[in-house]
């Protein structure tokens, strides 16, 4: 989600009519993000092209006061929140997490045009896979928090099923569905001829340890190597902040085996090379809490995708016209079978890769930002015409789906 926010900010910064301030949290340590050697990465200096105000702190109950104080200094025209339910705190600090989710409603009540991009909703989260304790109480609190978020001027969700849930269960009138989008402008056509030379690199990338698990993939991969000796498994990304040391345990077990590569946290500038050098992206998750950033980046760099058969990912593939082959959750045999089928067929690789690349052309970051800015402009015009303030104003515009494009759906290779 942080990477997504970075790319939103980069695209907004390109607009000469926009003055952007990024309101970030005060980082003290990032021990959950380690390099290829398992060493925690060091905190970098702020990017010089951005105006960053670090005004809130993770797991702090004082974040509403901190953010409201900062907004009184900035006096923005639009306040845009990029959120998941754990943005402001973990389940070990439920008051801080809940207080943070109330901030958008408070900001709107103070008279600011407020928008939330919400990456998941709790009705679609597998609580057991996400290691949620006291599930009943957590769901009750999440329902109240959702109602608080819906007091924003508008909300964007990244899967159509999420919008349906918010409309049907909460009777929300201010919810948009928009594509997650690729993390960049119009991509360059990849050089397919380089793939598999010398290795077929199978990429798994994410924040590991909770519902994003590696056990199934590592169980499947020895069978892949029997059939495809030049296959190589590349694991990249950080641990989930509640699961330090997770991917490092696999790295220790497979130390010295050159068919396994562990990259750890990958800086944004190295992401293009990581994807471009891969043959396929695998999403071996047990469940999902939203749309998939790695799947969209696979499209951006023209890669086939193999994924656990998760309902949200099927919706994503259909709605955004992705070529994805699915395997039953936790089924290592079927995952291995699909990897062998893909890597042994250059024709199938290119067909899926080209399909995903053309899907990426229809969901670039500039296109997405234009949709957001049009929506913000409409909200501001409505606000000025209404002349009301705060939570008393009811939006006079209807929530819309983003455009969908009549591009063919992916049919599994036969």
Task: Give the residues covered by each predicted segment.
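Glycosyltransferase donor-sugar binding loop
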Residues: 25-29, 232-248, 264
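Membrane-proximal helix-turn-helix segments that form the acceptor-binding/catalytic region
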Residues: 100-109, 134-154
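Donor nucleotide-sugar binding/catalytic pocket of nucleotide-sugar-dependent glycosyltransferases
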Residues: 145-187
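Conserved donor-binding/catalytic core segment of Leloir-type glycosyltransferases
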Residues: 194-221, 234
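Nucleotide-activated donor-binding/catalytic signature segment of Leloir-type glycosyltransferases, i.e.
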Residues: 247-272
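Acidic donor-binding loop of glycosyltransferase active sites
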Residues: 273-290, 303
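Conserved acidic donor-binding segment of nucleotide-sugar-dependent glycosyltransferases
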Residues: 324-332, 340-346
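A short, well-ordered alpha-helix in the C-terminal region of glycosyltransferases
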Residues: 348-362
